[in-house]
Structures are given as structure tokens and as C-alpha cells.
Design a protein with these regions (language model features):
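N-terminal FAD cofactor-binding segment of flavoenzymes
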Residues: 47-95
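C-terminal helical "tail/cap" subdomain of flavin- and related membrane-associated enzymes
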Residues: 347-570
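Short beta-strand to alpha-helix junction loop
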Residues: 60, 106-127, 261-266
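Predominantly flavin-linked oxidoreductase catalytic cores and closely associated redox partners
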Residues: 46, 128-282, 340
Length: 570
């Protein structure tokens, strides 16, 4: 796979996993003459169903692989089409899947995503890398990276023989033990202490067969539930069930140690015991395949950040070499697509003779801000996962905001368009408003969690019965010129403001007894009343009246009728 004996490259990428291979392909596609060397420490092809998190693609990551890297045909023919995300709440009915609130679609999502076997995907991408004239060296262990503005010196060992090459650019895609991050002391702690354990079974696990209730089964066509990324949700935890293309199934437990100590599930036997306690039906099914366990892995306190991602001194961190948040909603490949797109833009412009000093600063700041905003989706939220009504509203917001803004910007190259980014990041611009809306409503969910709410069960919900969610998902990938993109961003922001206002009305009426039709400023939502009994959320230039179409959609997932009682323990 290593064709050239060159000692000088324009780009050296350390790490031949998904991030490194896709970056090499993206750079080569945009600038075909670029000389690239990829160094990968594993000596052979990755095994099928290889032991990595990241089997489930969300829409942004799927767009990156399908459209940016031209892998649409490959993903359609060689991997599984994903039947979206599927959530099973109501943990009080963990022994009966038919009693749990089930949320997902009844048809394949309009914009497709996939379940991928990471071993197969990376092996096939490695072949594509070589076919495209990129040098890929397996069994290469990085030993040193001497960085200099006028050129880097990269040292590695191959077959126990020291080698050195020069490069104009050095990209670290070595994963969470990032060589470059340690060298430059860029490690940054993240206040999100969550642990995970996961294993693969050489067996097909189909939730359709967890009950013989024909009415429950018939909610969707046979076989489709299995193709979803299925989530079993409970207080302080979630469990994933993900199918892989050749038959195996990935099972994972992700939990907050404030509720579920890491040592209660940090071995396979402990994981099964934990499942018997918290997800007894799932445990009884999985017990039948105990002899078909392919592997087991744990990851303690998996979230981390970086002080910097990109530099005009011609280095960058790609994928998990930079930062990692949380596997919920499968954002891993999203961030690979985002970071690789920023890196590709910097590399190709620099190699073409352009000054990238400003762009590197803008992209680094954008990555940090996006990562910080994304973090509010997860931080201090695990205690709410067993509160079904809260989570239904959170799902609405998390899906709507993700499809309305990051997907729109990414698919239209907005994140690498300085004109668009200037508009997005301007004072009180869309970026600021988007971040503030997200922070406010995530805080609302946490505040709501301090109140007891009625248990919700016995509902099967089609997410695309909500017209605005169906529209936002179906619009992913639509292309706009600069003027129309800005207009679409504004339009989507107005919708998001209405969603926040309506969710707040429902919650405030439930908890505080406020009028259900009051005007609401979505940027000032607060469950606490002022001294005179009024609410700061009402009135002002940003206050919104009820939007009856948005209200009708949200009411399809609203089941609370009794006023909530305060209970500070969540």
C-alpha cells in the first residue's frame, strides 16, 4: 500500500482510521496534485465489526461521507441504511417493551444515514486511498514530529527501522491519545464525566421480537426497528443497540457515575448483571447469546477538549485527536466531517500560496464555539433520561436545532465561507442567538427536572407527524446561494424561536400556572417569577405570540395534565 519511496510530502497524516483516511481523500479530491502520506500503526486490515465507537451516522456525518467524499453508492450497497434514531422511554416498564413510549419514524428518513461496520468501512476506504494515489503505510509508529513554519520533520518506525520524512503540513488523526496534543500540551479537561462499556454479539438482535403483541409490532413495517439506532433510556443512563452489515450487533451502556458507578458495569459479566437490574427484558434477550460475544471494551470519563485545533503554522488536529463529547445522537462522524472540512480548506489554500492566518483563527474559534454549544445538549442531562415527558420535548428541540442550523451550514459550505461566518458570528447575529436559544432551553429542561411529572407510557410516536421536523429533515442537503442561505438561516431561526416559546408555554403553564396563550420572549425564558408575580419572559420586542401550527405539532408529544410538584432530587 506504500508505493512511493519519497522522503518529502506536502501533507503527512498520522492515523489511518476514519478521520485520517477521509481527510486524505478530501484533500486529494479538492487538490489532486497534493502529495500525501498516511501513517497507520496497525499492521494489517482492521477486522470486521472492529472494536470502535462510531457505527451509527447522523445526518451531517452521512452527508460528509455520501456527498463530500462521493461514497453514496458505496454506503448504499455495502453498509446498512439506518432507520433513524429510535428511543424507548418509560423505564418503569423496562420489563415490557410494549408499555414504553416509543419515539421514531414510521418510514426511512427523507435524508438517509447509515449504520456502518467500522472495520469494513476503514478497510474499503484504505483501498480507495491507495487507488487515488495516496501513500498509506501500515505498521508505522510515529516517534517524533519536529514542527517548523518552513517545514516539518516527521519520524516514525516501520519494521523496527527508523524513518524520517519532511512535510509542509502535519495532521494528527491518531485518536484520543493524540501525539501532537500531548507534545504541544493542548489537553483540556471537559466537565462531562460519563462512562461507557460496549460489546459486540455475533448475532442479530431484533427488537420486533421482544414482544408477540401484534398491535405493537404493526406500528411500523417488519424488520425496520432492527435497522434503527435503538436507545433504551433510564435515569442516569442509556443503552444502545446498533445492527452491523454482516449480522453482528453492537450493544453499549453509557451512564453517569452519579447514578451508576463505573465499577457496576465495567466487565462483561457486570454489564449483564447491570442490564438485569435496569433493563431486564433486554438482559433476558441478550443472555441467549452470551456465547457469541465478540469483544468487550470500556471507556471511563470519555469526554475531553482541546485548547487549539488548527494553526497557521501548518498543523491541525483531526477527529478524536482534538475533542470528544458524547456518543448520544452519534455526533462522532459529524465532528470528523466538520474538522476535516476546515483542515482541507486551510491545507489546500496554503499549498496554493494563500495566506491562511485569518482563516485558521476563524475556523479554530468556530470549532471551539460549536463544540461548547453542542456540549450543553449533554452536560448535566443524564438525570433527566428517565423523565419521559421532559425527554420528549428535549428530543423535539435537539432534532430541530441540529437539522435547522449545523446541517444547513455544513451542506452549503457555510462553515468555510468567511462572508457567511462573519454574518453568523456578528454581534447579536444568528450564531449568538442560536447559542443563546440552545443554552436557555437546555437550562429549562434541567429546571423542569426539579419537579415531579406524571409518568408517561403506552404511546407509539411518529416523529414525522410533527410537520416542522419532517420539513427540516427533508431539507437537509438542499443547496442555496449566499443570499438564499442567509435567508434560510433567518427563516430557520424564526422557527426555532417559536419552538422554544411554545415549549416554555407548556412547561410554565404546567409548573407555574401561567396563561397558556401568553406572549413569550424565547431569549428570556425562566421558570422563576419576579417579585410582583410577573414573568420576565413576557413582553418586549422579542416576545412571540402563539404559533398555532407549531403548537399543534408539539401537542402531539405532550401528555402532562396535572400540575407538577417540586422535587429537587433528579
Amino acid at each position: 500500500m506504500f508505493k512511493d519511496k519519497s522522503t518529502a510530502y506536502e501533507v503527512v497524516i498520522a492515523g489511518g482510521g476514519l478521520a485520517g483516511l477521509s481527510l486524505a481523500l478530501q484533500i486529494k479530491k479538492l487538490r489532486p496534485t497534493t502529495s500525501i502520506l498516511v501513517l497507520e500503526k496497525r499492521e494489517h486490515d482492521a477486522p470486521a465489526a472492529t472494536h470502535k465507537v462510531g457505527e451509527s451516522l447522523s445526518e451531517l456525518g452521512a452527508y460528509y461521507l455520501r456527498e463530500v467524499l462521493d461514497m453514496k453508492h458505496y454506503l448504499t450497497s455495502c453498509q446498512l441504511r439506518k432507520f433513524g434514531f429510535r428511543f424507548f422511554f418509560s423505564p418503569e416498564h423496562a420489563s415490557d417493551i410494549t408499555r414504553r413510549v416509543e419515539v421514531g419514524s414510521k418510514i426511512f428518513n427523507p435524508f438517509p444515514s447509515h449504520q456502518v461496520d467500522r472495520g469494513k468501512l476503514e478497510n474499503d476506504m484504505a483501498e480507495k486511498v491507495v487507488t487515488n494515489g495516496i501513500d498509506l503505510l501500515l505498521g508505522a509508529r510515529l516517534t517524533a514530529a519536529d514542527l517548523a513554519k518552513n517545514g516539518h520533520s516527521i519520524s516514525y518506525e516501520h519494521n523496527q527501522v527508523p524513518q524520517t520524512v519532511s512535510s509542509k503540513w502535519f495532521i494528527d488523526a491518531t485518536g484520543r491519545n493524540s501525539f501532537l496534543k500531548r507534545k504541544l500540551q493542548l489537553q483540556k479537561e471537559l466537565d462531562h464525566n460519563i462512562n461507557a462499556a460496549w460489546f459486540r454479539l455475533n448475532a442479530t438482535i431484533d427488537i420486533d421480537y421482544w414482544s408477540d403483541d401484534t398491535q405493537w409490532r404493526s406500528f411500523i413495517a417488519p424488520g425496520l426497528r432492527r435497522l434503527a439506532t435503538n436507545h433504551l433510556m433510564g435515569k442516569g443512563y442509556w443503552v444502545w443497540i446498533i445492527p452491523l452489515v454482516d449480522g453482528p450487533t453492537s450493544i453499549g451502556i453509557v451512564a453517569d457515575p452519579n447514578y451508576h458507578p463505573f465499577d457496576s458495569f465495567n466487565s462483561f459479566d457486570k454489564s449483564m448483571n447491570w442490564l438485569h437490574i435496569h433493563e431486564p427484558l433486554a438482559a433476558s434477550i441478550l443472555e441467549q447469546y452470551r456465547q457469541k460475544v465478540m469483544d468487550f471494551k470500556v471507556m471511563k470519563h470519555f469526554a475531553y477538549d482541546s485548547k487549539q485545533f488548527y494553526s497557521s503554522d501548518n498543523w491541525a488536529l483531526a477527529g478524536e485527536a482534538g475533542a470528544f463529547l458524547d456518543p448520544l445522537y452519534s455526533p462522532g462522524t459529524d465532528f470528523i466531517g466538520l474538522s476535516n472540512t476546515w483542515i482541507t480548506d486551510l491545507v489546500t489554500r496554503n499549498l496554493n500560496g494563500e495566506d491562511i492566518a485569518l482563516r485558521s483563527l476563524v475556523f479554530d474559534h468556530a470549532h471551539k464555539q460549536l463544540f461548547r454549544g453542542w456540549g450543553t445538549v449533554y452536560r448535566n442531562m443524564y438525570g433527566l433520561f428517565g423523565k419521559t415527558q421532559i425527554m420528549l420535548m428535549k428530543l423535539i428541540w435537539d432534532w430541530a436545532s441540529y437539522w435547522a442550523m449545523p446541517n444547513l451550514l455544513f451542506s452549503n459550505k457555510g462553515y468555510i465561507n468567511l462572508d457567511v461566518m462573519k454574518f453568523y458570528a456578528s454581534t447579536n447575529g444568528i450564531g449568538h442567538r442560536f447559542a443563546l436559544l440552545n443554552e436557555n432551553i437546555q437550562l429549562l429542561f434541567r429546571s423542569w427536572g426539579e419537579y415531579e411529572t406524571e409518568p408517561v407510557c403506552d404511546h407509539q410516536l411518529n416523529v414525522f407527524d410533527l410537520a416542522f421536523l419532517k420539513r427540516l429533515q427533508s431539507e437537509i442537503g438542499e443547496q442555496y446561494n449566499r443570499e438564499d442561505l442567509v435567508s434560510k438561516m433567518e427563516s430557520n431561526m424564526r422557527l426555532l424561536e417559536k419552538i422554544v416559546a411554545e415549549i416554555f408555554r407548556k412547561v410554565s403553564t404546567l409548573i407555574q400556572g401561567t396563561p397558556p396563550d401568553m406572549d413569550v420572549d424565547p431569549y428570556k425564558i425562566n421558570l422563576e417569577s419576579q417579585a410582583d408575580g410577573t414573568h420576565m419572559t413576557t413582553g418586549g420586542p422579542n416576545a412571540l405570540p402563539v404559533d398555532h401550527a407549531v403548537r399543534a405539532d408539539i401537542e402531539k408529544m405532550w401528555f402532562q395534565k396535572v400540575k407538577a410538584r417540586q422535587n429537587v432530587s433528579i
